[in-house]
């Protein structure tokens, strides 16, 4: 799990809206691929998955105050599409953060 601090309080709905609007277009642009990801709220978390290619979620994001707890599926750590999604998420979290300031709290 990775925990980042975005220095402002956010909600599942805000994260969901941002990812639904921007994740797939940015992925298509970066990978020159028509693969799209499903993004939805599940039990207080935002989950990203691609059922045609992967079993289960790729990422699960849970807001806790100013922190985001991000779980990456251990099955796809070295997968190029998962790495691309993670890179896009990092840039989108900077966009979401107060003054673009993202601090890594824990990575493990």
Where are these regions (language model features)?
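Negatively charged, low-complexity tracts enriched in Asp/Glu with abundant Ser/Thr
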Residues: 1-47
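Intrinsic disorder/low-structure terminal segments
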Residues: 26, 36, 56-58, 92
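Short secondary-structure junctions
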Residues: 26-32, 53-54, 97-101
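Intrinsically disordered, low-complexity regulatory segments enriched in Ser/Thr/Pro
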Residues: 55-83
């Amino acid at each position: 799990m990775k925990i980042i601090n975005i220095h402002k309080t956010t909600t599942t709905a805000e994260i969901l809206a941002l990812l639904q609007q921007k994740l797939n277009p940015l992925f298509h642009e970066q990978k020159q691929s028509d693969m799209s990801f499903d993004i939805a709220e599940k039990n207080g978390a935002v989950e990203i998955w691609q059922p045609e290619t992967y079993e289960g979620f790729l990422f699960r994001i849970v807001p806790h105050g100013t922190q985001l707890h991000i779980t990456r599926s251990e099955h796809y750590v070295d997968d190029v599409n998962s790495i691309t999604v993670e890179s896009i998420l990092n840039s989108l979290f900077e966009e979401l953060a107060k003054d673009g300031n993202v601090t890594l709290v824990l990575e493990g």
